[in-house]
Amino acid sequence: MGAAWAQTFSWGTCTVEVREPIRPAQRVLVLLPGWNYSRRCWCDSSRVCSLALAKGYRLILVEMGKSIYASDVFPETRADWRHYPTLRTLIDTVFPALLEKGFLWSGRSYLLGLSTGGRGVVMILAHTGRLFRAGAALSGDFDPHLDPKDRLLTGWYGPYGPRWENVDNPLSLSERLQVPLFLAHGQNDPFVPHLHSRRLYQHLQKKRPDLTVVYREVPHAGHDFTFWEQAGEWALEFFESL
């Protein structure tokens, strides 16, 4: 099922596209792309958008470019990456604008992200309380200790150091989560090891046993839309179960 209509806005450094379902929207789904993916990647490369529209979700697509959902731009951030949106762009500019226009509904909105966008889901939920009803992070990177030389992290934060550990560490920030979380990762992921999601799940089991967290680790699955389409469907089922 397609959208009844779509509108595009520019807020701060972020382009945002809103797609309305044919029937009146019942809830909102914010779709987060991975590093250097188009905001429309979910819709162009999977059935997730059409399935969500058919279920009555309003879709919000955000253009993040080469963002890693860092809290801010730092002195060490690569010059050619500085103009991309950050976590602060979303929290201080984009989400308030969406709320003001009535496109984002507190308590009836959900987050779904793939790859770096999965990291973004945890970063956003850690800073927004109960604005969102739940989140789903697919193939995300959460534990900076797994690869201290990661080129995306060093490109934003500089060499491994206190900032990785104390400022933008999704693993530790996850302890702040106030809403349910769905995690999924392929065991054959060649880009983001599945240990990222496994460690996050284990960390939350230990630190936040009160939090609803579901983790699906999938044998033979990789870092691609074959997996993300299936896991995206699971995420929608998870949201509907709450």
Q: What is the predicted function of each stretch?
A:
Residues 1-242:
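Non-catalytic cap/lid and distal C-terminal segments of serine-dependent acyl enzymes
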